[in-house]
């Protein structure tokens, strides 16, 4: 063990049994409760997500190794570390700065920069801004259980990682936000290594687009691209098509006991963004007339299917209605042009859960085809390997597909009788470059100065094992189209 770090000054609250009231505290003051004899695991420590970003020069020499983490339900704030200093004789240099609720990181009296954070549930991001600075991006989180409470502030905070002061670069407030801002996703839309856009939703059901393309942070702005009524508590995913991006997210929450027991209908959305301000989607009164194509989800035993509807009604995107009690609380994973969405449904009064993993065609929200990245779901009727199954006419069925109603169809997903989370692993990925072919640019990885991300998101570069690994070490393998040895055209590769 080289380092043990506790952000002990982080503000939080505890329930005082003597007065039946919430009282202010810090993580350091609460640490003693974790060691008490009767402790039963009912307190939060540092349970938020974190992002790791290693920065190297064009010779692969390490320049920085940043870690930016959120407190989650353990406190109202975030912390930044520089792990490149972990081998130094003075470990105090590892700690860069903390971001705390109701504090002003630049130590002046300008209240416009004052931080108003709730519990920072989710995962922050790190990205390179247009000015050339590396920055940490933090959502305001949730201050109050009641979504309509004025204590919930909806804002995106951006901090300079070039120094140890935590100097604020920007505070972008959403004036009509509701319920607090959820985790953001950073996007490099032109794949040049710098962040242009951030997307994030709020618990009121809205999705926002933060424009970060100007080199002057004072000119950064935010607008609504989707208006709804269902809580958005996880970061969206992004899929890059020929002439637009698809912002993919689900609705639902499991933050509180009431949320876990809630069985209201929730949805998965794919909202088209072609950089035009007129493309706002309003689904607050339902799908009809919203410009969204509604695709229908069906389940046969444990296997999931989406229909292949395309009637021209989806000019602004698509939507999938989930079954009663299902919800989405984690960021989808995009593989080629398929979004794999983890869907949770609680049962047994919240003590148990089932998990559905659903692959969705990002272009229309519907069925998968042999030209899609697709799951190889369990089942006697599904081709598990090449030559495993044939049609009634003797034709070989592609891996991951099956014959159904005289046609070859590819199942969209599968339902597991257990609560699991998944992580995508690709045997052929030889580095951890954090910018994807779709432009998702804020996650963990090594950013090599001067390197450009791959642009192909239509086919796999070669044969290899690709899987969604579950946290219980089970897995759901993925297959899809292979790129040809000879390129026919740039259009085939990129679009």
Question: How does the language model describe each region?
Answer:
Residues 1-495:
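A fold-level detector for beta-propeller and closely related beta-sheet-rich head/sensor domains
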């Amino acid at each position: 063990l080289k380092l043990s770090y506790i952000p002990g000054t982080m503000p939080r609250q505890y329930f005082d049994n003597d007065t039946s009231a919430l009282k202010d505290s810090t993580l350091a003051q609460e640490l003693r409760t974790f060691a008490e004899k009767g402790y039963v695991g009912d307190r939060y420590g540092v349970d938020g997500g974190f992002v790791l970003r290693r920065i190297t020069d064009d010779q692969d020499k390490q320049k920085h190794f940043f870690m930016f983490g959120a407190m989650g339900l353990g406190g109202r704030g975030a912390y930044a570390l520089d792990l490149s200093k972990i081998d130094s004789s003075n470990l105090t240099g590892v700690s860069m700065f903390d971001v705390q609720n109701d504090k002003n990181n630049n130590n002046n009296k300008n209240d416009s920069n004052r931080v108003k954070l709730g519990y920072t549930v989710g995962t922050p991001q790190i990205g390179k801004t247009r000015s050339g600075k590396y920055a940490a991006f933090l959502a305001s989180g949730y201050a109050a259980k009641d979504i309509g409470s004025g204590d919930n502030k909806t804002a995106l905070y951006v901090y300079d990682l070039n120094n140890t002061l935590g100097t604020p670069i920007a505070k972008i407030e959403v004036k009509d936000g509701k319920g607090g801002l959820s985790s953001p996703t950073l996007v490099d839309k032109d794949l040049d290594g710098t962040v242009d856009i951030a997307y994030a939703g709020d618990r009121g059901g809205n999705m926002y687009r933060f424009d970060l393309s100007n080199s002057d942070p004072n000119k950064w702005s935010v607008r609504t691209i989707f208006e709804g009524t269902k809580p958005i508590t996880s970061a969206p995913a992004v899929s890059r098509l020929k002439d637009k991006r698809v912002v993919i997210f689900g609705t639902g929450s499991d933050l509180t006991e009431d949320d876990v027991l809630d069985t209201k209908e929730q949805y998965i959305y794919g909202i088209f963004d072609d950089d035009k301000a007129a493309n706002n989607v309003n689904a607050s009164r339902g799908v009809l007339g919203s410009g969204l194509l509604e695709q229908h989800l069906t389940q046969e035993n444990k296997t999931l299917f989406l229909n292949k509807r395309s009637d021209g009604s989806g000019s602004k995107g698509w939507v999938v209605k989930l079954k009663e009690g299902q919800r989405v609380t984690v960021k989808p994973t995009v593989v080629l042009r398929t979004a794999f969405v983890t869907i949770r449904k609680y049962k047994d009064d919240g003590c148990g859960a089932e998990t559905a993993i659903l692959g969705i065609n990002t272009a229309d929200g519907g069925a998968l085809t042999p030209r899609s990245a697709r799951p190889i779901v369990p089942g006697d009727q599904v081709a598990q390997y090449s030559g495993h199954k044939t049609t009634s006419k003797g034709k070989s069925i592609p891996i991951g597909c099956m014959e159904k109603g005289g046609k070859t169809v590819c199942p969209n997903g599968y339902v597991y009788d257990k609560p699991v989370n998944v992580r995508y692993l690709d045997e052929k990925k030889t580095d951890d470059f954090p910018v994807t072919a779709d432009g998702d640019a804020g996650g963990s990885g090594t950013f090599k100065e001067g390197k450009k991300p791959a642009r192909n998101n239509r086919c796999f570069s070669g044969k290899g094992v690709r899987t969604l690994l579950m946290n219980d070490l089970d897995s759901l393998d993925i297959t899809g189209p292979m790129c040809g040895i000879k390129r026919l055209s740039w259009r085939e590769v990129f679009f």
